[in-house]
């Protein structure tokens, strides 16, 4: 083992960074192309980078003053200890002895090995890599000093292929923060963005330390650093190896935001657990009462909620609460820990949340964002990790336009997903979440990006998509694609699937909205959508459940707003009304926005119920949005990603106010689906499975559809009728099956509790008078 000198480095010191740069022969990029660095503003955690920007942050966050330094380095393979003195500082050889060896290339990230910790980082184009370690502080939380160590890696001894690596002995088993300075070519037009003065986050860091409290503006400039915890005992999963493993056809998915679910004071939780993983555990009884059996969590990877505060702009008042601004693909969002607990607590509490959901029979699906990162675009560049480690590998570039970032994500950059190294990172990330956190499935944001090659062109057989489908660790996971991107690659019904991939059915959303609000010419496509969208999925030899049916998702209007607004109202977003979709297929029922008109409110209530009935009787996998069970409003904002307020937060007092009406209807309708297998077949309907009570399909003005779904086992047929006309329709009811009679279960025109009666109300008439904008459901019973 070689021993090295230890230097106390003011990692907030520009002179130190410059000295390292000079020693390694690296020329800094011209200032005109300077990448915004988190090091050059106030630092909340360590203070790597330029000391000129250091300032005091929140009292609750540790501050680190500049301390004198020298830089630890290996010297031409000498076994002795060397110390390079800077700024007149010397240290004794015994003050903080560390030893190092060359290390190994795999696994990437930090790992325990015999005798120490191995650090491994990929960078194909780097010419220098420096490992930066911030050791646990001594004394109290408010201690100003910090012990910092840097290791300059040797290209001969500490590099295998494109992997830089080193083993360090004597480090604590937890509490160390680490990052890398990476230097390399300065050819911007060749795709390089190296800046060795910036300390970068390890892409394979399993835990990330950043600001302590969610959305605290005083901490906006804090950096994010990798950390690890080899001290804690393995998490006790108990019997959680028995995952729910629900059939896809049986799922009812509830899309939700961990923070927004309990952040509001009306949740009744104390301030330490509101908006946290533990807070969600407290509300599992609500999920069970509603009847959902899978939660789809908006991103819980570490993300930057204060990305809008990097520079003055019209959005700098906003806080990203949706989480589509990924910093790291392996670490859980640390600020979802209770009481500002940090990354280690976040990991443990997320596991506890998953364990408790599984105990309740609820699967956990993660919304994952592998299409872009938080590092923005070239106009407002920001360097956290990938850009400075190897921009040319990690991002799609237009090499015909000075290596500008391609933007198929709508967020400024696009991850180069099918590059072999990036592909493996994504697969490693997915396996990590399954193995370490027992996750049941994944929904892939803007998944069409994952179907593009390094030049941005669509691939017929994307390697990443295939390998996810065929991976042995992921073989039991639900994998769901959002089959479009912001570059126009719309793959609904055409997403490469290898018999595994399900899709968000965007056509279902649009066609149901148009029929229910009364658009002409929509009856036929409405019938196709509720019967499983065979036109999209049967042709590819898939199953009905491969189509995830939804009317509402986090993007766009809530269900209440869909029936309350004709236009989006996004002024609060600071984008001049240019954000959010303009084609919402919504109808305000006669008045734009809030109203006290009882007739309008009654019509809106019927329409929300109509949408929910259609969703729950459709073949395929239904998904609903958090808050729609009580009629949550965002006041017409159809792109509310940046509001850490009641606009997004679940309003528990409103749930209580509407529990006996709106909520009861939604809950009972979900339970009706669970109790009737003919509504969730694993094959497409044939002519013996359904009877369409219709003889004028070509009539474009017809807005009425009635049909019977047959139960070949017990004769429990279900009759459904949807009237999207603005007048009454007298529907002729077909005879019930032999020895059965019809029972009315649903009439959305009736007031609660008669709008849904689970046990049914006997109906004997030959006709049923169906009110305008209403739907009915009859069940055949003995």
Swiss-Prot record:
Biological process annotations from GO: amyloplast organization; starch biosynthetic process; starch catabolic process
EC number, as in UniProt: 3.2.1.68
Catalysis: reaction(s): Hydrolysis of (1->6)-alpha-D-glucosidic branch linkages in glycogen, amylopectin and their beta-limit dextrins
GO cellular component, one term: amyloplast
Gene Ontology molecular-function annotations: isoamylase activity
Active site as annotated: 445 (nucleophile), 482 (proton donor)
Uppermost EC category: hydrolase
Subcellular localization(s) per the UniProt record: Plastid, Chloroplast; Plastid, Amyloplast
UniProt keyword terms in alphabetical order: Amyloplast, Carbohydrate metabolism, Chloroplast, Glycosidase, Hydrolase, Plastid, Starch biosynthesis, Transit peptide
SMART domains membership: Aamy
Keyword match Hydrolase: yes
InterPro entries found in the cross-reference section: GlgX_Isoamylase_N_E_set, Glyco_hydro_13_cat_dom, Glyco_hydro_13_N, Glyco_hydro_b, Glycoside_hydrolase_SF, Ig-like_fold, Ig_E-set, ISOA1-3-like_C
Annotated stretches, region: Disordered: 68-88
One Pfam family it belongs to: ISOA1-3_C
Transit peptide start and end: 1-68
Keyword Transcription appears in the UniProt entry: no
Tissue: Expressed in leaves. Expressed at low levels in developing endosperm.
Function: Starch-debranching enzyme that plays a role in the degradation of transitory starch during the night in leaf blades, facilitates the formation of spherical amyloplasts containing compound granules in the endosperm, and affects morphological characteristics of plastids.
Protein name per the record: Isoamylase 3, chloroplastic
Record organism: Oryza sativa subsp. japonica (Rice)
């Amino acid at each position: 083992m070689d021993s090295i000198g230890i230097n106390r480095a003011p990692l907030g010191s520009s002179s130190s960074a410059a000295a390292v740069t000079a020693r390694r022969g690296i020329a800094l990029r011209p200032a005109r192309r300077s990448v915004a660095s988190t090091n050059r503003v106030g630092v909340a955690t360590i203070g790597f980078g330029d000391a000129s920007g250091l300032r005091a942050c929140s009292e609750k966050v540790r501050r680190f003053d500049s301390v004198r330094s020298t830089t630890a380095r290996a010297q031409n393979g000498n076994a002795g200890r060397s110390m390079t003195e800077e700024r007149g500082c010397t240290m004794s050889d015994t003050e903080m002895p560390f030893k190092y060896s060359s290390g190994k290339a795999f696994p990437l990230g930090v790992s325990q090995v015999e005798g120490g910790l191995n650090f491994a980082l990929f960078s194909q184009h780097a010419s220098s890599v420096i490992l930066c370690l911030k050791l646990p502080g001594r004394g109290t939380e408010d201690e100003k000093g910090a012990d910092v160590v840097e290791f300059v890696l040797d290209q001969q001894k500490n590099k295998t292929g494109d992997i830089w690596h080193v083993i360090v002995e004597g480090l604590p088993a937890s509490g160390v923060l680490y990052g890398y300075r990476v230097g390399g070519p300065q050819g911007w037009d060749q795709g390089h963005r190296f800046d060795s003065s910036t300390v970068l986050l390890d892409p394979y860091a399993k835990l990330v330390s950043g600001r302590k409290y969610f959305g605290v503006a005083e901490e906006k400039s804090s950096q994010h650093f990798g950390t690890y915890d080899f001290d804690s005992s393995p998490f006790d999963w108990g019997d959680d190896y028995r995952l729910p493993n629900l059939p896809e056809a049986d799922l009812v998915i509830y899309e939700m935001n961990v923070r927004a679910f309990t952040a509001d004071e009306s949740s009744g939780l104390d301030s330490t657990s509101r908006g946290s993983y533990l807070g969600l555990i407290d509300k599992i009884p609500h999920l069970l009462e509603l009847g959902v059996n899978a939660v789809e969590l908006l991103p819980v990877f570490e993300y930057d909620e204060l990305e809008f505060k990097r520079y003055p702009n019209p959005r700098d008042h906003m806080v990203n609460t949706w989480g589509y601004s990924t910093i790291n693909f392996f670490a859980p969002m640390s600020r979802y820990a209770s009481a500002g607990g940090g990354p280690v607590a976040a990991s443990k509490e997320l596991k506890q949340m998953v364990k408790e959901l599984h105990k309740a029979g609820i699967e956990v699906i993660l919304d994952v964002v592998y299409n872009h990162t938080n590092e923005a675009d070239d106009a407002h560049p920001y360097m956290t990790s990938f850009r400075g480690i190897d921009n040319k590998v990690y991002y799609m570039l237009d090499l015909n336009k000075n290596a500008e970032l391609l933007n198929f994500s709508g967020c400024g950059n696009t991850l180069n997903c099918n590059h072999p190294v990036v592909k493996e990172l994504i697969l490693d990330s997915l396996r990590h979440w399954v193995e370490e956190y027992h996750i049941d499935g994944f929904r892939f944001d803007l998944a069409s990006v994952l179907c593009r090659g390094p030049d941005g062109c669509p691939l017929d057989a994307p390697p990443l998509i295939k390998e996810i489908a065929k991976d042995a660790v992921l073989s039991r996971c639900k994998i769901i694609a959002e089959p479009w991107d912001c570059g126009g690659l719309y793959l609904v019904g055409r997403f490469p699937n290898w018999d595994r991939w399900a899709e968000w059915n965007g056509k279902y959303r649009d066609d149901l909205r148009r029929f229910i609000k009364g658009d002409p010419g929509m009856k036929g496509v409405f019938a196709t959508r509720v019967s499983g969208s065979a036109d999209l999925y049967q042709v590819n030899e898939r199953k009905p459940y491969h189509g995830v049916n939804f009317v509402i998702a986090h993007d766009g209007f809530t269900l209440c707003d869909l029936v309350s607004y004709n236009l989006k109202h996004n002024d609060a977003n600071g984008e001049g009304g240019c954000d959010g979709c303009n084609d919402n297929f919504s109808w305000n029922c006669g008045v734009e926005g809030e109203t006290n008109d009882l007739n309008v409110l009654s019509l809106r209530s019927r329409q929300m119920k109509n949408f929910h009935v259609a969703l729950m009787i459709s073949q395929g996998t239904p998904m609903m949005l958090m808050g729609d069970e009580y009629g949550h409003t965002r006041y017409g904002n159809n792109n509310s990603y940046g509001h850490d307020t009641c606009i997004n937060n679940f309003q528990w007092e409103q749930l209580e106010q509407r529990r006996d009406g709106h909520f009861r209807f939604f809950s009972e309708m979900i339970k009706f689906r669970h109790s009737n297998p003919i509504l969730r077949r694993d094959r497409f309907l044939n002519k013996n499975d359904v009877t369409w009570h219709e003889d004028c399909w070509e009539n474009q003005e017809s807005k009425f559809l009635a049909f019977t779904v047959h139960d070949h086992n017990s004769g429990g047929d279900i009759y459904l009728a949807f009237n999207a006309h603005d007048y009454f329709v007298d529907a002729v009811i077909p005879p019930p099956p032999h020895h059965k009679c019809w029972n009315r279960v649903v009439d959305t025109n009736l007031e609660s509790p008669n709008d849904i009666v689970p046990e049914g109300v006997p109906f004997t008439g030959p006709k049923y008078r169906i009110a305008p904008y209403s739907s009915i459901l009859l069940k055949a019973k003995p």
